[in-house]
Amino acid sequence: MRILFMGTPDIAAECLKALYSAGHDICAVYTRRDKPVGRKQVLTAPPVKEVALEHGTPVFQPRTLRDGSEDANIRALAPELIVVVAYGCILPKSVLELPKYGCINLHVSLLPKYRGSAPVQWSVLNGDAETGVSIMQMDEGLDTGDVLRCEKLAIGPEETSGELFDRVTAVGARVLCEVVPAIAAGTLTPQPQDHANATLAPMLNKEMAEFRLTESVAHIHNWVRGMNPWPCAWFVTSGGKKVKVVECRAVASQGEAPGTVLATKPLTVACADGGIQLLQVVPEGKKPMDGTSFAAGLRLKAGDVL
């Protein structure tokens, strides 16, 4: 099948690799523009662009598709199907209607749950036991199209968003490669989403990553897992210092007041209904360290307030 691929980050690059490996004809790739990265602001190509160029595939990087400026080019490419994975640009109706088989999108949640930019992170932040991937037939809405195929994945009790993202990427690439030939064969039955049960997964930011020791063990534990690797959960100590928490474990307590140090090896602190072991932290202005070293640096002892 002649496919036009649209995508930008690592998950899209892995899906594109899988489509190449499956022998599909990728007529062209659309991706976001190169952007400055890092402290030195080095102009860097999106992962999808790098994969496409390795395979000699034409790459297009328009600012937008919504103004119709790319319609003629896409029509000339004559794709039978457009595959979209985390592209970052909205497809107008004029593009959605161009290919014979329309446009499909890989979304890393069990739609209609977690429509939006950060479905993997919100599934962990909310303490869900499972998530999944969905392949949908795109329409003009935000992740509202009929679902062609979905597959569930269990979420581990200590799994971070980063770890889960690696797994859904692999599953998503596989499922996508199974769906494409099924579309050509006409063996799929699109299932309309239950819009009444839709939930949203908005983009994360650094301010959202804050938690308080007065909150529940479950909330803090989920927040630390869900904000890993970015933007990284953090709290403010009684002394006004910001501390990022990379890894933690939930433990029982004896009802001590939130913020009370329960132990220092490893550093364990009381919260609303239990205790949290702070296993890996990044104190404000310092390098990452384990919680025990952090406690030693502050000369904390059991009974102190962090």
Where are these regions (language model features)?
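An anion-binding loop in the catalytic cleft
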Residues: L213-L306
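Active-site-lining helix/loop region of Rossmann-like oxidoreductase modules
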Residues: E178-T237
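A structural microfeature
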Residues: A28, Q61, L148-R149
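Donor/substrate-binding cores of folate-linked one-carbon enzymes
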Residues: S21-A22, R32, L81-L200
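N-terminal Rossmann-like dinucleotide-binding module
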Residues: M1-R39
